[in-house]
Amino acid sequence: MEALRSTKLTKVYRKSKGPALDSVDLEIEAGQIFTMLGRNGAGKTTFLRIASTQLMPTSGTVSVLGLDVVRDAKQLRERIAITPQEAETIYPLTPRDHVLLNLRMRGMPKEEAKRRAQEALDELELSDVSDMNSDWLSGGMKQRVIVAMAIQTDAELIFLDEPTIGLDPLNRRKVWEQLTKLKKSGRTIVLTTHYMDEAEALSDNLVIINRGKVVASGTPRSVKEAVTLRSTRVDVYDRFTQSELGRYGRVSTIAGRFRVLTDEGGARSLGEEALARSATISMSPVTLDDVFVDIVGEAEKGEESET
């Protein structure tokens, strides 16, 4: 069943040089975790704001849970939840107050809201600070409070804009566990992130957006397979110049070393040449991070060549 569909969705802000979203077509199936990747300003947050009825599109349409986000906005808001990127806790409320009040405002009975709030605080390890003034919390704790407010609702679809930003690796994984649990219960989650490991670990499907356009979409595996001609990553530490490495694949410079994305044959040839030169290299499979840099870099080069 379809949870979200956008058709030629376009958003142009006043005085902007170009569209924030440029004719974006997306389909998101119900009961999955769908991730949006892109650089800052790529259009991810704009998409989430339109899909969650917070922003009007310039043109095109979006339907969420079968409802039009413009025509049926009021009805839709009762069935979705969102954690916006700019969300903040409120003085002098406690973490418990935040979660409890949010659930009550959505119409949840008092006793059930109390139980749900406590569950969220326990699962995200906020119990010890549950009755503390939110202004005294660390940035990571505040972020977990914001996430707890969304995931404990009965919303059928939850939008999360960079939900784990500012969290340490352990607490990021705790949020991942909760999102996976929500998916297993049949809920749909649409999130944005800059963490490629997060996208790879959580996503059923993902999309890469660059300058308002979709430049890649599919499962994490299929998106990586989109660069099958460069399936191996070779880091070269010495004894080669960038131009010499160019014949093996695409070359970039990272932290003082060259990184070559190549195919298996190219990696084999480069390995033999490195052995002959006594060069230091390391090889590993291409990651989603490599693919993101590769795809976005290619898209931007293409746009530059057109201007």
Show which residues each predicted segment covers.
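Short, charged/small-residue-rich alpha-helical element at the C-terminal edge
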Residues: L229-G302, T307
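A short, proline-enriched helix->beta-strand linker immediately N-terminal to the Walker B motif
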Residues: Q152-E156
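Catalytic Walker B motif of ABC-type/P-loop ATPase nucleotide-binding domains
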Residues: I158-E162
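Conserved ABC ATPase "signature" region
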Residues: L100, R104, E111-V129
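Conserved ABC ATPase signature
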Residues: P92, N133-G140
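ABC transporter nucleotide-binding domain
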Residues: W176-D263
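A short, flexible loop at the N-terminus of ABC-type nucleotide-binding domains that lies
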Residues: M1-S6, K11-S23, D72-A73
